[in-house]
Amino acid sequence: MEAPASAQTPHPHEPISFGIDQILNSPDQDSAPAPRGPDGASYLGGPPGGRPGATYPSLPASFAGLGAPFEDAGSYSVNLSLAPAGVIRVPAHRPLPGAVPPPLPSALPAMPSVPTVSSLGGLNFPWMESSRRFVKDRFTAAAALTPFTVTRRIGHPYQNRTPPKRKKPRTSFSRVQICELEKRFHRQKYLASAERAALAKSLKMTDAQVKTWFQNRRTKWRRQTAEEREAERQQASRLMLQLQHDAFQKSLNDSIQPDPLCLHNSSLFALQNLQPWEEDSSKVPAVTSLV
């Protein structure tokens, strides 16, 4: 039994008075819904097939910088706009990785400029002025204490040292003066003030030159005397060692006189004639038994 045809035909849904469009106060209640893609998302740029889609009002002035960077963001155009109630419709497909939108300079608020080091260098504070004045006074006082500062050369570290004082040139004497000084020194090692002045006048020298020469000559004489005494002492030591060695060798080479007590005792006689340091044992007399 077939059902009547009127029962199979679906009835159109009546509009609900408390739907989303009524809540959002959308004036476009009777407009056709936007075409949707395979995944259920609506096309914002334009539906396939060339059919005109729903038109949306433009962005308000506060969102003017949001839509411009995304107009040419990929192979298809993306139209960011707001719904009548302020809802932003988002495309179902994300833009390609190569179409990354640039930063939004117009949408970002103006950040206050950060002070740099160069700008901070010109700032002056009271405590900075006092510190500078203290350092300046301190350096001024140090410079006043050392007015005669030695300037050092710039270069190798060994060249930065203070140059040494120049030595006085060595005074050279003539052969006649040296001979007269040596003769007087052999006769007299020390001179009095009057004797020194007379010798200096006779040799056409100054008192200081004669005094310095005698001081240096005495130092040389003491060193030579000490060296000679040391050489004599070493020579005497070597002589004593030689004499001791000769005496020891002579005592070894002398024949041992037999003791009368050992003649009647074979053991004592053998010990008396025993000489272990001798290499030739044939010289040792044979022990004869006297018993």
From Swiss-Prot:
Region (Disordered), start-end ranges: 1-56
UniProt subcellular location: Nucleus
InterPro entries to which the protein is assigned, alphabetical: HD, HD_metazoa, Homeobox_CS, Homeodomain-like_sf, TLX1/2/3
DNA-binding residues: 166-225
GO biological process: animal organ development; central nervous system development; GABAergic neuron differentiation; negative regulation of neuron differentiation; neuron fate specification; neuron migration; regulation of respiratory gaseous exchange by nervous system process; regulation of transcription by RNA polymerase II
UniProt-recorded Gene Ontology molecular function terms: DNA-binding transcription factor activity, RNA polymerase II-specific; sequence-specific double-stranded DNA binding
Keyword DNA-binding tagged: yes
Main location: nucleus
Keyword Nucleus: yes
GO cellular component: chromatin; nucleoplasm; nucleus
Entry keywords, A to Z: Developmental protein, DNA-binding, Homeobox, Nucleus
The protein's name: T-cell leukemia homeobox protein 3
Species per Swiss-Prot/TrEMBL record: Homo sapiens
Lineage: Eukaryota, Metazoa, Chordata, Craniata, Vertebrata
Name of the gene: TLX3
